[in-house]
A protein has these predicted regions:
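Membrane-interface loop-to-helix entry segments
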Residues: 1, 118-123, 140-189, 194-202
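Membrane-interface "cap" regions at the ends of multi-pass membrane proteins
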Residues: 1-31, 75, 246-248, 252
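Flexible loop linkers connecting adjacent transmembrane helices
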Residues: 1-12, 36-46, 58-90, 281-288
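Membrane-interface alpha-helices at helix entry/exit sites of multi-pass transporters
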Residues: 7-12, 42-51, 84-88, 92-100, ...
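Select transmembrane alpha-helical segments in multipass membrane proteins
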Residues: 10-21, 92-107, 145-148, 210-230, ...
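Helix-loop junctions at the membrane interface of multi-pass solute transporters
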Residues: 25, 34-41, 67-73, 104, ...
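Helix-loop-helix module between adjacent transmembrane segments
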Residues: 52-76, 82-83, 87-117, 121-156
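Extracellular/periplasmic helix-exit of transmembrane alpha-helices
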Residues: 62-70, 75, 182-200, 208, ...
């Protein structure tokens, strides 16, 4: 039986922590990232991305379990993550602080910038097709998109973790299930192509030239890089959400977060099948 305390109203449930971490995993890495991986490495990159998910789930389990073990508690709930277990577990305070600073900079200027760039690029494609005399940059749409994203980010940033958890627990399942449903429809409509697509993935994954031809750009390396970018296993972001969950045993949250990697893999496979059915990768357009 879990011990109840006065801070429970600020705690995340294991499901809410799962949805927060899934929200960070479900994004451009699952859609544009898949397209870029297939264009750069061929259909076989999808195979290595899936294989990386099995290895990544172990990383997700370990980092989330450690986040639960070394978390701390205050009046706003639980706090933890890699910075905390580096400091409290390894006893290296400066390294934990450095990790926290690098993670903040990476997400503020790297991941968020890539998300907004991809969204803006998608709008630009359709804007150019409309044939307007005003360029996309002059239209003010890029600034408008940036302001909208900034507003949503600010709301989440200044909200308490349990509020973010509640919002994510409603939005993320709907978002993920809707996308998977659309992918299933696409697969059903192209049912006859499934054997050929699977054969193409396997042959490309183990093609000698694709594996060893310029190893830094080989199908294996591309698949692994895109897989890690998509599922975020071992990157140190998901454990921050995992630490905020109120659970009876650290391992339970570790298992929940490991499952999130397989949810991400399912969405990646769905995106990959859509790209391969359409043969859009042959145009060398990455969608980024």
């Amino acid at each position: 039986v879990e011990k109840k305390d006065k801070y429970n109203k600020h705690h995340l449930t294991p499901f809410q922590a799962l949805m927060i971490s899934t929200a960070s995993r479900f994004g451009i890495g699952n859609i544009a990232g898949i397209s870029a991986a297939i264009v750069a490495g061929g259909p076989g990159a999808l195979f290595w991305m899936c294989l990386m998910a099995f290895l990544g789930s172990a990383s997700a389990f370990i980092e989330s379990t450690l986040a639960q073990i070394y978390k701390t508690k205050d009046v706003f709930g639980f706090k933890g993550g890699p910075a905390y277990y580096i400091k409290n577990g390894l006893g290296i305070k400066w390294l934990g602080s450095l990790f926290a600073i690098i993670l903040i900079i990476t997400y503020a200027y790297g991941f968020n910038g890539l998300q907004s760039y991809t969204m803006t690029s998608a709008f630009e494609i359709y804007y150019d097709k409309a044939g307007s005399n005003i360029t996309f940059a002059q239209s003010g749409l890029p600034i408008g998109i940036g302001l909208i994203l900034t507003a949503f980010t600010a709301v989440m940033f200044f909200s308490k973790s349990h509020i973010i958890g509640k919002v994510s627990s409603y939005i993320v399942p709907f978002m993920a299930l809707t996308y998977i449903l659309l992918a299933i429809i696409a697969i059903v409509l192209n049912f006859k192509e499934i054997p050929a697509v699977i054969k193409m993935i396997i042959e490309s994954a183990f093609d000698f030239k694709a594996i060893f031809g310029g190893f830094a750009g080989s199908v294996i390396v591309i698949g692994i890089k895109r897989g890690l970018f998509s599922n975020e296993a071992g990157m140190g972001s998901a454990p921050n959400a995992a630490a905020a969950a109120h659970t009876s045993h650290p391992v339970k949250q570790g298992l929940v977060q490991a499952m999130a990697v397989f949810i991400d893999m399912t969405i990646c496979v769905a995106s990959g099948m859509i790209v391969l059915f359409s043969q859009a990768y042959l145009t060398k357009q990455t969608g980024v």
